[in-house]
């Protein structure tokens, strides 16, 4: 009889599955599903009556038992057992079925599982071989276990509900406890055994198990949970296991729960009990259900093969020996099998089940795929959102702020971000002090817009390095001599090393000075002797200068001199000057790799006729240096490839002959010099070939350009002739119609064409500059269109707009020009009121140029009559970007007559130039003294005292200098100290006691100036403190940083730290601490500092005279060495 299994969780194609059930019902197979009841078929026989009964029962696959009291279901099961026992099938009450839960029925035997399916062929063979031995073992078992049967009978039958072992049983229940057999382990869950023919020859007793516990999740199944879950979908997690006792006649045997020898052992370790008559009167069925955690499926998951203890194996062997059967050595490893006929049906049943399972799983997968496809189709079928175009020609104006919640800037422009990253200000530093960063960036933006980064900025600096020097004269002492005239390196349009200004106040509070040294000393008063470093940018600008700043390596490339980003400390220069006396050598010039490669080729290769073109080529292209084992002599090389600084000139020593070739190496040893010569020859050949190819390409391009120019000229001439002919025809027609009176329009057209022709031929003298520029732009546009962009580049939209609407562009430029002219006229009118009328050339003689600025030069002269040496600043007003600042400086100098301030003598307007005559300070600036000398604390105190006296005078008149630094402190040869450069001065009055303009040089700026707070005269005291550090260490703090980062450090760090504070006295450190207070309210004033103990012990200014002379001699020596190189 066969059975059908309902599957409640199958997909919607259940009708197909149901029809398949009826089709497969002809085949004996079993199929289970998770949480689905399974229908068992059992045949019960009575050996005494030789009758059999078929009983079917439906049971859930997930089973469990209660461990304590009997549930109502257990009571119903017991009642069903009594009913069956009362039937003719059970004539004797003593034959009772023992049921145990597998939780407590585990014994010492091992268990092996098979996959969910039918046993293999080996299992069938093992089961068939154990059928006959099981019956004989039953007889020996009945004869040798009377006491055990009595013990079991005394128990009155052990019900399955009594599952938990008590303390008296020692963990064994039922017959297992009576026989002394150890319990089976409980860690493995037995699987469902196959329905074999032995099931048709045994006693049956109705049983209804309890509800199973919850199914464990995949995470509880162990590391291979996914594999287990895939198998458990087809296998029951809580499965029953069966043990059967064989009939007495041995015709139908094969217990499935015992050993291969036929031991009636259930997986739970309970022996089957026979009748006390000595033979089995009835076969009893034992079923045990496992509630343990499901185990991993193995090859034999449908049956449990339990291995009994050693005594039980001995009994099995004795029983087989009594029957005359040999002991199967593989009985422990081979599973038991039923008869061959039944095993075939079982095997076929398992195969059909596998096919059906695969069919169901594949159809389930197909259903899921169809659901996914339908869902995706529904998603894609939805109407797409219409795309809305963004705004065009939009301008986004944002306010730069800081979000304290996220710690980031809001609305920060990209140029600001780039400048911050290039200046070395990290994101963390910017987030820590956002307000300081915003103030600094706003200041830099204003400086770039105003273009006032240097005091004479905006003019062409070509030839700014021309200086006239006068050697030392024994009679007259030191003649006027220029200080190192190195212009400041620029970063784009910004000159970062010179004083800065942002004019946000009144007209008089503008921040551009008229010169680097308002009171002219022995130096370049426009070009500062020390420049600030480049920010660490990839594409920094270069400075055109004839003289490099001291301590800065210079590299000559194409006739230009560029300053390196890092400015070394001046300590090395001062130490070298002290150690070597006055013969101070300049720093070595950075050698060019180009000249190195050429010099190496000349030294290694003999002179050849091809050397001249090769040298010409190498001078403009860098060649790789050949490898060499011996070190090469390197040094600075100029354009002519000479050796570095300190080496003798080429004419001093004759050129040595080429070295002899090295001796040949022994046989078998490769020469290390051969690759050099081969490489050198190869390089020479390649360079010659490349040079020839390059010259050929240049010649071809030149010829092509000439052809294009000739074709364009011919086209223009042809077009002009055609236009002339047309105009002549029109004029003739009009003259014929109107008689002798020609029309005005043809004359205008003819005149315009004549002007165009004259402009082409060079006779455009009658046109205005605007008309000439417009005609040139039109011609360039035509040439670009004719050549396709090869000449003049591609046509841009801006050029077309200008040409299409030249009137608007001309009107805008005209308005700007008129505004500038009106402003200049106002400045000139104001200067005429201030300046003295007359010709300065008749009042001063022997003008000697000692410096060159952006908008003028600095001269020394002698006053006619008094023979007084004076300094004259000559400025071209047309090239001066901030003309109103000149007025500010002249007015401040006129009103400030003091022994510590460079005195103003007179001013003149002559030939469009402004002449400012001032006192001449031949000692130069304090920068020279600091650079070439080491100063003592007493000498530093003298400088501070004299500077404070000058500041006290300015502050008493309501004037703030705002640019105190060593460059603006001049000395005489006697050591006298005076302040200069009053271009940044600001007037403080009762209505305007505080200023907010950010002006000055970054490294000397006070924190309140950097942060753009209100400030007063105490900003000069902070700058004095920084200048004191400059005299101690040779340079101001943060000089090796970019100006932008220096401003950030000033705003965030406050008082700078000294490099060696222990080397200073306590009084000096107290003086610096008072002058460098971050809070302006706690900072001392000029009058208070003059009373400090440090200044009371300072030396006289006469002690500075030797330092001035030493600095002058060191500068002369340096200039001579540079001239020789």
Curated annotation (Swiss-Prot):
Has the keyword Oxidoreductase been applied to this entry?
A: no
- The positions flagged as active site in the entry are 963
Instruction: Identify the PROSITE patterns for this entry.
Output: CRIB, PROTEIN_KINASE_ATP, PROTEIN_KINASE_DOM, PROTEIN_KINASE_ST
Residues in CRIB domain copies? 388-401
Composition skew (Basic and acidic residues), residue ranges: 51-60, 71-81, 99-125, 600-614, 694-703
Show the catalytic activity: L-seryl-[protein] + ATP = O-phospho-L-seryl-[protein] + ADP + H(+); L-threonyl-[protein] + ATP = O-phospho-L-threonyl-[protein] + ADP + H(+)
Any GO molecular function:
protein serine kinase activity
Sequence positions that bind ATP? 850-858, 873
Q: Which residues belong to any copy of the Protein kinase domain? A: 844-1095
Which intervals carry biased composition (Gly residues)?
Answer: 251-261, 514-524, 635-644
- Give the matching Gene3D superfamilies: CRIB domain, Phosphorylase Kinase, domain 1, Transferase(Phosphotransferase) domain 1
Q: Does the keyword RNA-binding apply?
A: no
Where is this chain primarily localised? cytoplasm
Which InterPro entries does its entry note? CRIB_dom, CRIB_dom_sf, Kinase-like_dom_sf, PAK3-like, PAK_BD, Prot_kinase_dom, Protein_kinase_ATP_BS, Ser/Thr_kinase_AS
Q: What is its EC number?
A: 2.7.11.1
Q: Which GO CC annotations does the UniProt entry carry? A: cytoplasm; nucleus
This chain belongs to the protein called Serine/threonine-protein kinase STE20
Q: Where is the composition biased (Low complexity)?
A: 128-154, 543-568, 706-738, 747-762
Q: Where is the composition biased (Pro residues)?
A: 651-668
What keywords does the record list, in alphabetical order?
A: ATP-binding, Cytoplasm, Kinase, Nucleotide-binding, Nucleus, Pheromone response, Serine/threonine-protein kinase, Transferase
Q: What class of enzyme is it?
A: transferase
Outline what the protein does. Answer: MAP4K component of the MAPK pathway required for the mating pheromone response and the regulation of cell polarity and cell cycle.
């Amino acid at each position: 009889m066969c059975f059908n299994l309902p599957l409640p969780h199958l997909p919607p194609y259940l009708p197909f599955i149901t029809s398949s059930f009826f089709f497969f019902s002809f085949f004996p197979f079993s199929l289970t599903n998770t949480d689905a009841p399974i229908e068992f078929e059992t045949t019960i026989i009575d050996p005494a009556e030789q009758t059999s009964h078929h009983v079917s029962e439906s049971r859930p696959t997930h089973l469990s038992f209660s461990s304590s009291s009997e549930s109502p279901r257990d009571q119903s099961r017991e009642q069903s057992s009594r009913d069956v026992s009362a039937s003719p099938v059970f004539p004797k009450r003593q034959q009772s079925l023992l049921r145990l839960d597998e939780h407590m029925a585990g014994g010492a035997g091992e268990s092996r599982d098979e996959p969910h399916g039918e046993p293999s062929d080996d299992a069938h063979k093992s089961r068939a071989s154990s059928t006959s031995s099981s019956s004989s073992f039953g007889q020996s078992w009945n004869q040798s276990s009377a006491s055990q049967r009595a013990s079991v009978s005394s128990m009155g039958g052990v019900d399955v509900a009594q599952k938990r072992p008590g303390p008296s049983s020692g963990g064994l229940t039922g017959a297992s406890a009576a026989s002394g057999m150890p319990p089976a382990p409980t860690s493995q869950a037995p699987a469902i055994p196959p329905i074999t023919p032995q099931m048709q020859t045994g006693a049956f007793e109705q049983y209804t198990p309890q509800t199973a516990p919850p199914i464990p999740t995949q995470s509880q199944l162990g590391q291979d949970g996914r594999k287990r879950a895939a198998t458990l979908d087809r296998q029951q997690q809580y499965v029953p296991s069966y043990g059967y006792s064989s009939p007495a006649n041995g015709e139908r045997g094969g217990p499935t729960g015992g050993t291969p020898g036929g031991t009636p052992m259930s997986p739970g370790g309970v022996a089957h009990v026979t009748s006390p008559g000595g033979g089995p009167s009835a076969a009893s069925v034992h079923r045990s259900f496992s509630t343990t955690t499901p185990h991993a499926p193995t090859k034999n998951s449908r049956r449990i093969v339990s291995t009994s203890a050693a005594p039980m194996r001995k009994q099995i062997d004795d029983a087989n020996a009594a029957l005359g059967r040999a002991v199967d050595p593989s009985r422990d490893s081979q599973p038991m099998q039923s008869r061959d006929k039944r095993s075939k049906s079982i095997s076929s049943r398992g195969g059909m089940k596998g096919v059906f399972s695969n069919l169901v799983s594949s159809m389930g997968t197909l259903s899921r795929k169809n659901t996914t496809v339908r869902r995706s189709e529904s998603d894609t079928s939805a109407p797409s959102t219409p795309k809305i175009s963004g705004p065009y020609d939009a301008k986004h104006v944002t306010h730069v702020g800081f979000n304290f919640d996220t710690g980031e800037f809001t609305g920060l422009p990209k140029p600001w971000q780039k400048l911050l990253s290039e200046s070395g200000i990290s994101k963390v530093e910017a987030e820590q002090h956002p307000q300081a960063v915003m103030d600094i960036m706003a200041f830099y933006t204003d400086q770039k817009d105003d273009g006032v980064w240097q005091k004479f900025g905006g003019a062409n600096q070509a030839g700014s390095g021309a200086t006239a020097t006068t050697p030392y004269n024994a009679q007259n002492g030191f003649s006027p001599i220029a200080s190192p005239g190195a212009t400041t390196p620029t970063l784009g349009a910004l000159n970062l090393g010179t004083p800065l200004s942002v004019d946000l106040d009144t007209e008089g509070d503008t921040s551009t000075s008229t010169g680097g040294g308002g009171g002219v000393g022995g130096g370049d008063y426009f070009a500062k002797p020390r420049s600030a470093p480049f920010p660490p940018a990839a594409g920094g600008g270069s400075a055109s200068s004839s003289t490099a700043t001291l301590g800065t390596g210079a590299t000559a490339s194409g006739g230009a001199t560029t300053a390196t980003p890092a400015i070394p400390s001046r300590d090395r220069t001062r130490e070298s000057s002290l150690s070597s006396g006055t013969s101070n050598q300049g720093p070595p010039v950075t050698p060019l790799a180009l000249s190195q490669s050429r010099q190496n080729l000349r030294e290694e290769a003999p002179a050849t006729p091809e050397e001249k073109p090769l040298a010409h080529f190498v001078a403009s292209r860098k060649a790789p240096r050949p490898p060499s084992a011996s070190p090469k002599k390197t040094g600075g090389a100029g354009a002519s490839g000479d050796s570095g600084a300190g080496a003798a000139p080429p004419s001093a020593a004759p050129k040595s002959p080429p070295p002899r070739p090295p001796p040949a190496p022994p046989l078998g040893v490769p020469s290390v010099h051969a690759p050099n010569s081969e490489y050198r020859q190869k390089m020479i050949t390649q360079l010659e070939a490349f040079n020839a190819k390059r010259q050929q390409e240049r010649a071809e391009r030149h010829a092509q350009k000439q052809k294009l120019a000739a074709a364009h000229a011919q086209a223009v001439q042809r077009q002009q002739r055609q236009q002339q002919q047309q105009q002549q025809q029109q004029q003739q027609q009009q003259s014929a119609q109107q008689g002798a009176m020609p029309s005005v329009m043809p004359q205008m057209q003819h005149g315009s064409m004549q002007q165009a022709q004259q402009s082409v031929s060079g006779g455009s003298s009658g046109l205005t500059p605007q008309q000439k520029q417009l005609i040139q732009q039109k011609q360039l546009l035509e040439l670009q269109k004719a050549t396709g962009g090869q000449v003049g580049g591609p046509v841009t939209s801006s050029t077309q707009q200008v040409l299409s609407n030249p009137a608007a562009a001309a009107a805008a430029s005209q308005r700007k020009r008129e505004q500038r002219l009106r402003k200049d006229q106002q400045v000139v009118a104001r200067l005429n009121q201030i300046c003295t009328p007359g010709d300065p050339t008749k009042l001063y003689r022997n003008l000697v140029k000692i410096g060159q600025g952006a908008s003028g030069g600095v001269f020394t002269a002698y006053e006619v009559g008094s023979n007084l040496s004076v300094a004259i600043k000559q400025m071209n007003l047309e090239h001066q970007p901030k003309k109103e600042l000149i007025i500010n400086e002249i007015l401040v100098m006129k009103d400030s007559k003091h022994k510590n301030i460079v005195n103003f003598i007179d001013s003149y307007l002559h030939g469009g130039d402004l002449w400012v005559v001032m006192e001449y300070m031949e000692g130069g600036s304090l920068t020279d003294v600091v650079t070439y000398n080491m100063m003592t604390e007493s000498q530093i105190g003298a400088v501070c005292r004299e500077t404070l006296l000058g500041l006290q005078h300015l502050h008493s008149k309501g004037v703030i200098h705002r640019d105190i630094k060593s460059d603006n402190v001049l000395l005489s040869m006697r050591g006298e100290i005076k302040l200069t450069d009053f271009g940044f001065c600001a007037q403080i009055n009762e209505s305007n006691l505080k200023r907010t303009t950010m002006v000055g040089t970054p490294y000397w700026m006070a924190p309140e100036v950097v942060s753009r707070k209100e400030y007063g005269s105490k900003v000069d005291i902070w700058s004095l403190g920084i200048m004191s550090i400059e005299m101690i260490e040779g340079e101001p703090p943060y000089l090796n940083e970019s100006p932008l980062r220096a401003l950030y450090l000033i705003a965030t760090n406050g008082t700078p730290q000294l490099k060696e504070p222990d080397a200073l006295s306590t009084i000096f450190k107290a003086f610096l601490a008072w002058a460098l207070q971050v809070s302006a309210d706690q900072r001392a004033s000029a009058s208070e500092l003059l009373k400090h103990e440090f200044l009371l012990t300072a030396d006289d200014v006469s002690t500075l005279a030797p330092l001035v002379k030493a600095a002058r001699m060191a500068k002369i020596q340096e200039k001579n060495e540079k001239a020789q190189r």
